[in-house]
Amino acid sequence: HAYDAYMREYLKMALEWLGSTRTPVILLSATLPESQREEMAKAYLKGWRNSKLELPSEAKRGGIQELKRRQLAAKNEKVYVNEPKLVQERGISSVHKVSSAYPVLTYTSDTEIKHMDVKPSGRSMNVRCQIVDDSDEALISLLDRLLEDGGCVGVICDTVGRAQHAAKLLSDYFGSEYVKLTHSRFMDIDRMSNEAELRQLLGPDSTVGNGERPQRMIVVGTQVLEQSLDIDFDTLVTDIAPVDLIMQRLGRVHRHRRGNNECDRPSLLREAACYIRGIAFWNDNGPEFAKGVDAVYDVASLMESLAVLELTGSSAFCTQCLPKDIARTVRNAYGNDVRSLVPTAWNMQYDKGCEERANKQEKKRADAHSYLIQSVAVMNRKRSLVDWFSPQIDETDDDKGQRAVRDTQDTVEVMLLCKHDGEVCLLPWIGDKRNGIERGAVIPVDTVPCDDVAKVAAQCSVRLPVALCAHGRIDSLIAALEEGCGTEAAYWQESPWLAGKLALFLHEDAEKHLSSDELCGYTISYSRGDGLTYTKKEDN
């Protein structure tokens, strides 16, 4: 789900080329909108149609279809195949109407796009979704009530800043031993450790009975909690987000069965619930979103999410039946009739948001084509690698092509290391016991570090916040980092693990806090519990 209008252009071109080479592709998503499924399938078939490879014979194609049916039948799954009248569009056939079932399998057959309804797993649940106030006091009060008898709650925030603020707030009230924080501003090695710990504590095999699952725990994080982690919360608090992401987040509530009728969960948390915050206040003409939330997601998409879920007031609530409601809810949010679901009083603000979103997406699509390879059809005509890329990268922007796949603001990745008594070291808790690297080990600067030390140092990488790189400051930031490395990094360029990497040296004060010298008007701090934080010089 790390894609947007910009990255989709790259994804479609990749699918087109994979189609041209007859390469099977599987895309898995619980919440992919119908229009995007169709868009991706058409991109694949566009390449398939323009391929120069020999098409399989009718007999072979029939054998493949029969094999598919036999494989499904062998699993004793009752499969419903929807094959209504096909609509021809530029050589590609597509079903006229997609089934409303969930799950649904979309697949290509020669030049046709087809859909197959697959029987659900059998487990379903109702999740009560409710709007709550965005204030600090409301968050503390809510969790204080919910965790009266214990339990494990997830708090998903849309920005790292909101997550760090919530974690500190909750740590101060409930105690830091009950609160864990995870987000993208942890060093790679710490982030992997955080996620491994969460899987151990909240995974399918951890229970209160076997001593693995905590009696009480609050996990605060960003979107990393909605992606790939097989963890299970007793209840969830989340910032508002586009509806497909809300559905992803709901999948972390009561993800695994905990006894008959969830009897192994605390009594107050046996009914699945999700509390949605991130709305600063409600105006007559629509919601005003909290600072930072509308910087991550388009206002129009957030309003559509609220409208589709019928959460249109400060005390609104609804019930979602999972997985049955996923397809319908996502389809409504991304369908052509979504405006009719938005309250009339919101229309002015919503229309403005739609216009801003459309302009932004059009710019993203146009920007993506600057460094997109040529289509299969064009290459079939020109047949020259020289023509594969249309743009020319000049010396002033020779790395733009490498950055182009993700439409993110330019930022810089650094290794966080510690300077102590004139030596460069790993951070105090960082080491590799398996390979004999002690915590806080010294990294040599007068010789090439051995591979074991260099690999650990390379895993101490993190991206600096966008704020440090804004307004064209990235060149001066890189220059300051290079100057800060001085001669310490000279021998590191001979290491395949460290060559070309920038380092930011932190210093430990009397209270064991790690922070940098001033860097382009900012001070960078890092801790094992909070990750990377930064303050402007005038804020110090």
Regions found by a protein language model. Give the residues of each.
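Short, flexible loop segments at the rims of nucleotide/cofactor-binding pockets, characterized by
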Residues: 2-5, 128-134, 214
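Conserved helicase ATPase motor motifs in RecA-like P-loop NTPase domains
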Residues: 2-6, 15-45
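Short, glycine/acidic-rich hinge or "gate" loops at secondary-structure transitions
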Residues: 30-38, 53-55, 264-266
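Conserved interdomain linker/interface between the two RecA-like ATPase lobes of SF2 helicase motors
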Residues: 23, 27, 47-158
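Residues immediately C-terminal
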Residues: 1-5, 33, 162, 227, ...
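Structural recognition of the conserved hydrophobic beta-strand(s) that form the central parallel beta-sheet
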Residues: 24-29, 217-222, 275
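Conserved two-lobed SF2 helicase motor
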Residues: 209-226, 238
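C-terminal helicase lobe and adjacent C-terminal extensions/tails of nucleic-acid helicase motors
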Residues: 37, 126, 130-133, 137-200, ...
